[in-house]
């Protein structure tokens, strides 16, 4: 919710900004009024504008009222000296295609650009796009121009990083739209495992890409990260960073169990943080910042 985003941004500005933490990212389903858990609701009603572009659910993000989108929330985050990001799924809402909504900037409809055979296996909200058609580029241009108008600094595109070879062209079209939108944005691709043989393609078209599926507080998962980091570390450099996923530290699983803490021991947390830093991989914190304990705060600030 907007309240959660604002409180975490305020905490980051007060306690973490001086140590290099700078992005506040709104995760999945911000456009679904009924989203209430980590389970996806098949064929839920999603909030869109007249061009099939997803908009924040106003019951959860009240500053978006009146069709202004995330602009007020992004402005607040920027006022704290931080940057603002969002999560999206690749493609367009299936609702937009079924309603044959127009695509901004061209004569085609969403139905003409959609690929009904390209659907995420775990979230049925979207259709992939027919990226051989100009209408697909026009749609992606329209959403990135919208995000630029909101003041978005970071876009995480899901259901794409491991979907080679059939999503290679879609990655290229998304990248082109992002670069042409008139605002500098980090382009992050998920989920993994991204294929190692596509490293040069990923470095050319994205800033970050996930090496794994969702990473949780499990020692076997953490141990496996060493092998992935060893293979990918040579591809890390300015502008292109292999991503080991968020750090599952502190208070996580807040929807299911608000009092639950990470299952990692302090030794495992030190191991995780050390590996991410020596690779180096992007540091994205996955817990509730306002509940940080002294150990975790010291760990992620290296104090």
What is the predicted role of each segment?
Residues 1:
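An acidic-aromatic substrate-binding cleft motif
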Residues 99-103, 169-174, 202-203:
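Short low-complexity, flexible loop/linker segments enriched in glycine and/or proline
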Residues 143-193:
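Extracytoplasmic, non-cytosolic globular domains
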């Amino acid at each position: 919710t907007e309240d959660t985003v604002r409180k975490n941004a305020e905490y980051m500005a007060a306690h973490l900004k001086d140590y290099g933490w700078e992005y506040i990212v709104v995760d999945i389903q911000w456009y679904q009024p009924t989203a209430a858990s980590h389970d996806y609701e098949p064929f839920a009603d999603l909030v869109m504008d007249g061009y099939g572009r997803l908009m924040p659910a106003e019951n959860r993000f009240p500053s978006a009222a009146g069709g202004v989108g995330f602009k007020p929330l992004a402005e607040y985050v920027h006022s704290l000296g931080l940057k603002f990001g969002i999560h999206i799924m690749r493609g367009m809402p299936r609702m937009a295609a079924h309603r044959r909504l127009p695509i901004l900037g061209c004569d085609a409809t969403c139905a003409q650009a959609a690929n009904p055979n390209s659907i995420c296996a775990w979230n049925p909200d979207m259709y992939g796009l027919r990226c051989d058609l100009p209408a697909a580029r026009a749609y992606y241009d329209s959403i990135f121009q919208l995000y630029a108008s909101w003041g978005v600094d970071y876009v995480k595109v899901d259901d794409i990083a491991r979907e080679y070879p059939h999503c290679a062209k879609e990655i290229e079209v998304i990248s082109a739209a992002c670069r042409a939108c008139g605002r500098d944005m980090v382009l992050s691709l998920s989920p993994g495992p991204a294929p190692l043989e596509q490293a040069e393609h990923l470095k050319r078209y994205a800033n970050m890409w996930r090496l794994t599926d969702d990473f949780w507080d499990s020692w076997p998962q953490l141990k496996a990260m060493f092998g992935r980091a060893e293979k990918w570390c040579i591809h890390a450099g300015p502008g292109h960073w292999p991503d080991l996923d968020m750090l599952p530290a502190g208070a996580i699983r807040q929807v299911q169990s608000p009092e639950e803490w990470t299952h990692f021991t302090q030794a495992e947390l030190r191991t995780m943080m050390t590996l991410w830093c020596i690779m180096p991989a992007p540091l994205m914190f996955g817990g509730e910042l306002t509940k940080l304990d002294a150990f975790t705060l010291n760990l992620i600030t290296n104090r």
